Amino acid sequence: MFVPFLIMLREGLEAALIVSLIASYLKRTQRGRWIGVMWIGVLLAAALCLGLGIFINETTGEFPQKEQELFEGIVAVIAVVILTWMVFWMRKVSRNVKVQLEQAVDSALQRGNHHGWALVMMVFFAVAREGLESVFFLLAAFQQDVGIWPPLGAMLGLATAVVLGFLLYWGGIRLNLGAFFKWTSLFILFVAAGLAAGAIRAFHEAGLWNHFQEIAFDMSAVLSTHSLFGTLMEGIFGYQEAPSVSEVAVWFIYLIPALVAFVLPPRAGATASRSV
């Protein structure tokens, strides 16, 4: 529940910030009449992401067992790529995102008689990017943790992001976005490492990967996945009490370079924004 909550809080807050920045810029430049058009783009993006998520989830439920495992592995790999890209992309562009959005709004509203649709599509693509990232991560998370709690956590995270977005827009709160994205990004890298190890496990169960399947270690006597804390670790970080050598290797092969890249100072002009 906690991982879907955090991911949807982060992704939802990114989308809310995009919408808030666009709406504020439209009002500040005496173009508030276009805010309604902006919301059309937001709703279209939300509908696309929701529809795609439902379609993929319902379709894959009919797959045979091996194909289901293969699909789970592919989705996990896609989720790892998206989460990693999300972490480092936000780290790179967060300082300039406001200027980029304002320039995109100006460009959209200068396109002759079709500027309304241009604004709709600009907002649509900006919000849909965040939503599609969430779709693939949630598909991977729901496959690892079956039950009502992951969807509930995702909905609570999204609802919290919406509330925070409105408060930021109205000026009711100031949030240190630099610290928020820094610490959630670090957490997400550990989540992605667990997904990468889970992908190898899924490919083995699908019959595609049968190398290095010896048990690396057995922690069942110390931290069983049947215990409360073990269950939480499994749901959040993909913890396995008796992982294979290949799972442990993939976990380290992904996480160590990712952490090194993360702790290195960003290049000039790519530091995180401090607050909004």
Curated annotation (Swiss-Prot):
List GO molecular-function terms, semicolon-separated. Answer: ferrous iron transmembrane transporter activity
- Sequence ranges on the Periplasmic membrane side: 1, 56-69, 140-147, 201-244
Keyword Transport among record annotations: yes
Can you say where in the cell this protein is located? Cell inner membrane
Key words, A-Z? Cell inner membrane, Cell membrane, Ion transport, Iron, Iron transport, Membrane, Transmembrane, Transmembrane helix, Transport
Q: Which residues cross the membrane?
A: 2-22, 35-55, 70-90, 119-139, 148-168, 180-200, 245-265
Q: Which domain of life is it from?
A: Bacteria
**Entry GO terms, CC:** high-affinity iron permease complex
For the keyword DNA-binding, the answer is no
InterPro entries assigned to the protein according to its UniProt record, in alphabetical order: EfeU/FTR1-like (IPR005217), FTR1/Fip1/EfeU (IPR004923), MFS_trans_sf (IPR036259)
Cystine bridges: which residues? none
Give the record's membrane topology.
Multi-pass membrane protein
Residue intervals on the Cytoplasmic side: 23-34, 91-118, 169-179, 266-276
Subunit structure as annotated in this protein's UniProt entry: Part of a ferrous iron transporter composed of EfeU, EfeO and EfeB.
Similarity remark: Belongs to the oxidase-dependent Fe transporter (OFeT) (TC 9.A.10.1) family.
Role this protein plays = Uptake of Fe(2+) ions across the membrane.
Q: What is this protein called?
A: Ferrous iron permease EfeU
